[in-house]
Structures are given as structure tokens and as C-alpha cells.
Amino acid sequence: MEEGGRSPREEAAEPQESGGDAEPGGGRRALLLPPGDPPHPHPHPHRITNFFIDNILRPEFGRRKEAGGTAGEPRRPGAESRRSPAAAAPAPGAPVPGGGGGGGGGSPGRGEGGPAALALHGAAKKGGDPAALEAALKARGLSGAELSVSSDSDSSQAGSNAGNQPMLWPAWVYCTRYSDRPSSGPRSRKPKKKNPNKEDKRPRTAFTAEQLQRLKAEFQTNRYLTEQRRQSLAQELGLNESQIKIWFQNKRAKIKKATGSKNSLAVHLMAQGLYNHSTTAKDGKSDSE
């Protein structure tokens, strides 16, 4: 038999001995693969990790063992806090926790922008060691610029989602004594003038003796003037209607304070203990006030 010729039994046994590692261009490799999948030039090597449920649930998962410590030695609670954050970053060749899932290497598209890369980024920022960050990112095939872009896009997406939600008002807005509407808000006081002008106040009316005598006589007749009677008095005394009206109001208030008589509503409220504003009359006031 010639050297180039092979029996069918040898050709069938050759793929089993090689374990499927034939060249990509060979016809035998193409026949073994499904028709839809292209041949992979460099398949990912199978990596054994400790990502079991029991290991993940342990408190020491993801922490590197302390130098000089044994597996059976109990961990001290203050030992982890004394280590620097830069020591938590893995070496360039070491496997990064969280990158692979339960089946080994994991997909590259899923692990590039995952939470493990963000955790590495934050740990290196706190530790202030950019070299450790770059080494860890290169081990995962990710650069710092891509990580920053992905984190910015995540933050912008979170901001847009928050903007779509209706704005919620805090509870204290609805508990104010001003109003239950948030649009009203707290009332602002008007600023007081430092130098009040005398023109802002209403000028006091200086009644003559004849005018006072006529007003007192009219008050004895009727304490409440009608509009026609007020107009006629204003024409007779040469005063404004507002001046006569204010004088009658002040006169009634003085008599009410002097006598101490209260209306029926005040008496009813005082009986219930809701009103007890006692007033005293002040002497020495002239009638011109």
C-alpha cells in the first residue's frame, strides 16, 4: 500500500486522537463543525474556577488571603480594614472574580461592562494606583476610556429614567400651616423700611373747637351716621367724609374700652375659655385723637 493512501478506519480514528484541534483550513475540521458556525481560530481554554454556590455565599469570597495566614486560621475583623484598597486589585495574570460565570471564561461582551469592572475602577480610584487599574483592565481586555464611557452612559440613562417619573414633593410641604398646595410655598415677609417717611403715615386731623363741639353733639344724638347725614356734616364743617367717619369710629372704640362691655360673642368665648383679652382704658387722651 502507498504512503499517501490511508484506510477509512485510520481517517475515522484521526479526529478522535487529535481531539478536534486540526487546522481551521482543513476539510476534516469543517466537516466536524455544524454548517452555521464558522471555525474558531483560537478557542478559549477551559478554566476551572471556584464559583460554586457554597463558595459565593461564604463571607471570605472574593478576598485574597492574607500573607502568612493559613486556611484554618480565623479571620480577624480588623485585618481586612487595615489593608490598603490598592492591594485588593488583582495581578495582571490573575483571574478576576465575577468575569466568568459558572462555566469558565464567560462571554467577553457580558463581562466588559459588568459590575466587576466598575468595582475595580472604584477600588483603584480610592487607592490612588492607576498602574494597578490599567493592569487589571488589560487583563479583561478593557481600557479606562471605555470604562468611563460605559459608566457615563449608565448614569445618563439613570438620569433620563428619573426625569420621566413625576416629581415627588417631600412630606413637609403638605404639613405647613400656610397651605397644602406645594405651589404656594412659605410666605415671605416684606422687608421693613429702615427710614420710614412721614408722608407714608396718614396725617392727623387737627379739629377746631367748633368742629369738636358739633361732632360731640351729633354723637350724643346718634352714634352711627347715615351716608346722607355724613355728607351734610362734611359740607357744614368743611371736612372730608372720611375724617368724620374715622372720628366716629375712634369715639365708639374709646367708649367701649372705658366701659369694658363686651359683645355676646366675646362673652360666649370667654365662658368656654377661648377668649380672655382684657383691655384697660388709657387716660389723658384728648378728643381730637
UniProtKB/Swiss-Prot annotation:
Q: What is the lineage of its organism?
A: Eukaryota, Metazoa, Chordata, Craniata, Vertebrata
Biased-composition ranges, Low complexity, are: 142-160
Q: Which family does it belong to?
A: Belongs to the engrailed homeobox family.
Primary subcellular site in the record, as a coarse category = nucleus
Which Pfam families does this one have? Engrail_1_C_sig, Homeodomain
> SMART domains per the record?
HOX
The Gene Ontology biological process annotation of the record reads:
axon guidance; central nervous system neuron differentiation; dopaminergic neuron differentiation; embryonic brain development; hindbrain development; midbrain development; negative regulation of neuron apoptotic process; negative regulation of transcription by RNA polymerase II
Q: Which gene encodes it?
A: EN2
Q: What are the GO MF terms of this UniProt record? A: DNA-binding transcription activator activity, RNA polymerase II-specific; DNA-binding transcription factor activity, RNA polymerase II-specific; RNA polymerase II cis-regulatory region sequence-specific DNA binding; RNA polymerase II-specific DNA-binding transcription factor binding; transcription corepressor activity
Tell me which residues form the DNA-binding region. Answer: 200-259
Q: Where is the composition biased (Basic and acidic residues)?
A: 1-12, 60-83
Q: Which organism is the protein's source?
A: Gallus gallus
- Give positions of region: Disordered: 1-166, 179-206
One Gene Ontology cellular component term attached to this UniProt record is: nucleoplasm
Q: What protein am I looking at?
A: Homeobox protein engrailed-2
Comp. bias (Gly residues)? 96-114
Subcellular location per UniProt equals:
Nucleus
Q: Which SUPFAM superfamilies match?
A: Homeodomain-like (SSF46689)
